[in-house]
Curated annotation (Swiss-Prot):
Organism whose genome encodes this protein: Histophilus somni (strain 2336)
Protein name per its UniProtKB record: Phenylalanine--tRNA ligase alpha subunit
Chain's gene name: pheS
NCBIfam families attached to this UniProt entry: pheS
GO molecular function terms attached to this record: ATP binding; magnesium ion binding; phenylalanine-tRNA ligase activity; tRNA binding
Catalysed transformations (reactions): tRNA(Phe) + L-phenylalanine + ATP = L-phenylalanyl-tRNA(Phe) + AMP + diphosphate + H(+)
Cofactor annotation remark: Binds 2 magnesium ions per tetramer.
Length: 329
């Protein structure tokens, strides 16, 4: 019953006789010797029939035999795994004559390209860049811009509020107010930045980019504003576009206008809003509207980018799809 040397030798020969070099074959032998009905399991169960004096010595011999067989199994498994690995590596050999993989080079995001184009154009005309906080107060986002509490224009902004006084800015116009508070006319600034509104569809996202212009001087007038925007739009789109100004309404400008360009399909396309700075806005920052006047321009960067590159869904700019972004390198 306890011819352990014979059992060990039989196991060794069975392992050595395996030809297919598969782990499944080794597993079958392991089960034959170590499974619930295996040889060594039966031997261990038979210890209950051995006298108490002999049981420790017999048990030790059985364990020694088990360890020998297990070591043979483990060694054979390692050997076969190494053979399988070498065969797989030989099949996966690298052909050094093949061309290497090209490194993907990064590029500017189309929104960044548009911002740079706008800033570059107006910088040549003496406009400087000013920035402001994205978490804005009710005063700078609305009150100082001639949009008091309960004004119906507030309902159009779909504002993200933190509390009664703080919000995510819905426009970069607050930068204009902060600039006029700290600078004396003449003032020529651009205010690019992120703005936030609770809206999401094919032409709107909760976060988007605006660029606003502000020009304040003693002789600022609407004719000058029209000429400036004509030149800008033709330079930006690199075409001799038809441009029209439609009367509109903004609380912070008077008179106000929407600016359209003629599309290739023969339809007018809205591109930006503008107007003469409202006298109340100038008074709110301590500038005498009887002495100074100014004009302001607001443009959505994503909208300009969509029109320039014929993009139909604004959300494409924020989905990080490399197939889309590669087109703008």
């Amino acid at each position: 019953m306890y011819n352990l040397q014979e059992i060990t030798e039989e196991a060794r020969k069975a392992i050595e006789a395996l030809q297919d070099k598969s782990i499944e074959s080794l597993e079958a032998i392991r089960v034959e010797y170590f499974g619930k009905k295996g040889h060594f399991t039966q031997l261990m169960q038979g210890l209950r029939d051995v006298s108490a004096e002999e049981r420790p010595a017999v048990g030790a011999k059985i364990n020694e035999a088990k360890q020998k067989v297990q070591a043979i199994l483990n060694a054979k498994k390692v050997e076969w795994e190494e053979i399988a690995l070498n065969e797989r590596l030989a099949q996966e050999r690298i052909d050094v004559s093949l061309p290497g993989r090209k490194m993907e080079l990064g590029g500017l995001h189309p929104v960044s390209i548009t911002i740079n184009r706008v800033v570059q154009f107006f910088s040549k005309l003496g406009f400087t860049v000013e920035i402001g906080p994205e978490i804005e107060t009710d005063y700078y986002n609305f009150d100082a811009l001639n949009i008091p509490k309960h004004h119906p224009a507030r309902a159009d902004h779909d504002t993200f509020w933190f509390d009664a006084e703080r919000l995510l800015r819905t426009q970069t116009s607050g930068v204009q107010i902060r600039t006029m508070e700290k600078m004396c006319p003449p003032i020529r600034i651009m205010a690019p930045g992120k703005v936030y509104r609770n809206d999401y569809d094919q032409t709107h996202t909760p976060m988007f980019h605006q660029i606003e212009l502000l020009y304040v001087d003693k002789k600022a007038n609407f004719t000058e504003l029209k000429g400036l925007l004509h030149d800008f739009l033709r330079a930006f789109f690199e075409e001799d576009l038809q441009v029209r100004f439609r009367p509109s309404y903004f609380p912070f400008t008077e008179p106000s206008a929407e600016v359209d360009v003629m599309g290739k399909n023969g339809k007018w396309l809205e591109v930006l809003g503008c107007g003469m700075v409202h006298p109340n806005v100038l008074r709110n920052v301590g500038i005498d509207p009887n002495e100074y006047s100014g004009f302001a321009v607001g443009m959505g960067v994503e909208r300009l980018t969509m029109l320039r590159y014929n993009v139909t869904d604004l959300r494409s700019f924020f989905e990080n799809d490399l197939r889309f972004l590669k087109q703008f390198k």
